């Protein structure tokens, strides 16, 4: 009994509910003005029905949002006539009835300010066709009168919608930028965390025969061809010795006087006025460490009382205490000085003698 009674109650409520086109605020011959929040007269907006035997629909065919649900006029029902253009039809043969619309029970009493009633429009129906079928009312010329003055409410939708579109676009661009930043960070960060000074002959654990040292060693004026291939073949072996020097400070070289003297003999000399171009001297090494050419010129002016290489190492250690021997090995490899790399590897060798 309980579910059946609830279902019956719901059906009764649906039957008593007003149709969707009926206004919840105004009487039958009025319509709700959503802009002014009041009830306006259908007659004051559309004028009298333009064709004989037509009357106003309920609420002029407008809903409470100001949208047209049906045309404002409809043909009188059977036995009803309206020859004088009244608001509603009346029984044929009787006098025209002028209704006095009033708000229903519970409806708002607010009414809009009265306006002049427009003149009666021209009836588009021909004398030979005094009426049109009800199925054609929506597309008939008479029904088009209802659309002469649409409500301006829908025109305000786009300006209110524009800030939301701009906000969505900005949020989308921000999310894309964040995702790109995260992607680049994940791609580049592991490379930065890897050893910033890779050793010659080793690229990802595989011997590399295309290091800059090969091109420099085979260039004119560097070394003889036989010595070039001999020293280039030593690079993979030297890399194992240099790998132990990766974390050792560069200042250690100042204490290893024997190794330092050998490097001075190899790197400090420059060719005379008639010599060829020098490759991989102390002057080039200073440029790798970011020192200006004026500093190199001043350091070379102190020869022979002071070695430019020793002055360079002291300058780098003072300016960057974290400088390592591995960084020096990388610069020597980029300059193509395999002979200097062989001398530097003595600091990492344990009882190994190089011929």
Curated annotation (Swiss-Prot):
Q: Indicate whether NADP appears among the record's keywords.
A: no
The ranges of region (Disordered) come to 120-147
List the InterPro entries hit by this protein, alphabetically. DEATH-like_dom_sf, IGFLR1
Which regions of this chain are Extracellular-facing, per the record's topological domains? 23-163
| Broad class of where this protein is predominantly found | membrane
Instruction: Specify whether Membrane is a keyword of the entry.
Output: yes
Provide the induction entry. Up-regulated by the pro-inflammatory cytokine TNFA and in skin upon tissue inflammation.
Q: How does it sit in the membrane?
A: Single-pass type I membrane protein
As for subcellular location, the record says:
Cell membrane
Gene Ontology CC annotation, any one: plasma membrane
Q: Where is the composition biased (Low complexity)?
A: 132-144
Which stretches are transmembrane? Answer: 164-184
Q: Which residues lie on this side of the membrane: Cytoplasmic?
A: 185-355
N-terminal signal peptide: 1-22
What does the UniProt keyword field contain? Cell membrane, Membrane, Receptor, Signal, Transmembrane, Transmembrane helix
- Please describe what this protein does: Probable cell membrane receptor for the IGF-like family proteins. Binds IGFL1 and IGFL3 with a higher affinity. May also bind IGFL2.
The UniProt entry, under PANTHER family, shows: IGF-LIKE FAMILY RECEPTOR 1
Name used for this protein in its record: IGF-like family receptor 1
Gene source species: Homo sapiens (Human)
């Amino acid at each position: 009994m309980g579910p059946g009674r609830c279902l019956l109650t719901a059906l009764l409520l649906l039957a008593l509910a007003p149709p969707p086109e009926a206004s919840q605020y105004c009487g039958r011959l009025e319509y709700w003005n959503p802009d002014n929040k009041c009830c306006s007269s259908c007659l004051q907006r559309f004028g009298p029905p333009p064709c004989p035997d037509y009357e106003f629909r309920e609420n002029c065919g407008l809903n409470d949002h100001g949208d047209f649900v049906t045309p404002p006029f409809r043909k009188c029902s059977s036995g009803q006539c309206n020859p004088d253009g009244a608001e509603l039809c009346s029984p044929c043969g009787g006098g025209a009835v002028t209704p006095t619309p009033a708000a229903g029970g519970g409806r708002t009493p607010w009414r809009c300010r009265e306006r002049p009633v427009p003149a009666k429009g021209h009836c588009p129906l021909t004398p030979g066709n005094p009426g049109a079928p009800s199925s054609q009312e929506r597309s008939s010329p008479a029904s088009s009168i209802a659309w002469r003055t649409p409500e301006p409410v829908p025109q305000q939708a786009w300006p209110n919608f524009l800030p939301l579109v701009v906000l969505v676009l900005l949020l989308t661009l921000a999310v894309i930028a964040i995702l790109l930043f995260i992607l680049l960070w994940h791609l580049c960060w592991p490379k930065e965390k890897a050893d910033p000074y890779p050793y010659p002959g080793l690229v990802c654990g595989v011997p590399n025969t295309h290091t800059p040292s090969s091109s420099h060693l085979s260039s004119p004026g560097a070394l003889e061809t036989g010595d070039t291939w001999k020293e280039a073949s030593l690079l993979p072996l030297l890399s194992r010795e240099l790998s132990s020097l990766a974390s050792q400070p560069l200042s250690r070289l100042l204490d290893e006087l024997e190794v330092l003297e050998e490097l001075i003999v190899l790197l400090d000399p420059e060719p005379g006025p008639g010599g060829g171009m020098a490759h991989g001297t102390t002057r080039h090494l200073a440029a790798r460490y970011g020192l200006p050419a004026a500093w190199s010129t001043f350091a070379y002016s102190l020869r022979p009382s002071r070695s430019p290489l020793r002055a360079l190492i002291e300058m780098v250690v003072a300016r960057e205490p974290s400088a390592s021997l591995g960084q020096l090995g990388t610069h020597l490899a980029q300059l193509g000085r395999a002979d200097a790399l062989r001398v530097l590897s003595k600091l990492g060798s344990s009882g190994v003698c190089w011929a």
